[in-house]
Each structure stands twice: as structure tokens, then as C-alpha cells.
Regions:
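C-lobe/activation-segment region of protein kinase-like
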Residues: 69-72, 86-150
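Flexible beta-alpha connector loops of hexameric P-loop NTPases
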Residues: 1, 48-49, 106
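Amphipathic alpha-helical transducer elements in NTP-driven molecular machines
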Residues: 3-10, 57, 111-114
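Hydrophobic residue at the +6 position relative to the catalytic HRD Asp in the kinase catalytic loop
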Residues: 78-85
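Conserved alphaE helix
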Residues: 52-63
Length: 150
């Protein structure tokens, strides 16, 4: 990570933490490195089953929505490799590539983040969600999100 990416990640987390977005807490930053508070979770990609995959998906999308609507921040690299889960709760990690919603490609990046997560849940847990409806939800154009187990 370079110095600018570390600053960008630190800034994003500083904006999102007070909004109750599930992000790791920064303990310290020195030039290009961030030290985060320890999280006892595993990458979502490592799970072959979840106790309640629909709830986990809803929680991820709720965090994406809050990040976008209240924080004005888009992760821009969201996938199953950037979500930690401890069996009870999630954390969205890896924010050095985050962009503000005023970025010219912000909607494309937001849609890509949503599609990456929906694709993973469909493939791994057979959970279906309408991509258009999920997009409307995270953009604040709908208050409901329909998720169906296949």
C-alpha cells in the first residue's frame, strides 16, 4: 500500500465508524501502513456454510447502503475476500481504493460491489436477490430488499 492509499483508507474508516458501519478500528497509521484493532473473524470466502446466509447478506448490503448514503463512501473493491465474519457479525475491510460518491465512476463501482456480493451468495449459498432491487436499496431509492433462498 502506498501513502495515499493508506490515507484514503484511514479517512474512509474515520467517516464510517461513527455511522456504525462495520469496519475495523484504526489503532495507528505510519506513512503507508495502518494498524487495525484485531478482529477474530475469517474471510467470508472461507465459509462453506453460514448459520443464516440471508441475514449475513442483508447486513453486508445494509453496510454498503449506510456507507454510500450517510458516509458518501464506496468501497470500490467489495467481494467475499473483503468481508470478515465471526459467526455472529460482519466487518467490511480493505478500504484503500475507496472513492467518494462524487467520483465520476461512483455508480459503476457501487453496482460492481453489489454484484460481486450477490454473485458470491448465489453461487455459494444459493441465495437469490434481484440485482436491480439490491441496487435501488443501497442507493436509497427503496427501503426494502427481497432475498430468497433457492
Amino acid at each position: 500500500m502506498n501513502v495515499e492509499a493508506a490515507k484514503r483508507e484511514h479517512r474512509a474508516i474515520d467517516i464510517l465508524l461513527p455511522l456504525k458501519v462495520a469496519v475495523p478500528e484504526v489503532v495507528a497509521r505510519e506513512r503507508h501502513a495502518l494498524l487495525m484493532k484485531r478482529i477474530d473473524g475469517n474471510l467470508l470466502s472461507e465459509y462453506s456454510e453460514l448459520p443464516d446466509p440471508e441475514t449475513v447478506l442483508r447486513e453486508i448490503l445494509r453496510n454498503v447502503r449506510t456507507s454510500y448514503l450517510e458516509g458518501g463512501i464506496i468501497n470500490a473493491d467489495l467481494s467475499e475476500y473483503n468481508v470478515l465474519f465471526d459467526g455472529r457479525r460482519i466487518w467490511v475491510i480493505d478500504w484503500p481504493q475507496a472513492v467518494e460518491k462524487t467520483h465520476p465512476n461512483s455508480l459503476f463501482l457501487l453496482e460492481r460491489d453489489v454484484m460481486n456480493i450477490l454473485r458470491f451468495f448465489r453461487r455459494k449459498f444459493r441465495i437469490e436477490s434481484n440485482p436491480s432491487a439490491a441496487s435501488l436499496y443501497v442507493r436509497g431509492m427503496s427501503d426494502t430488499l427481497e432475498i430468497v433462498s433457492a
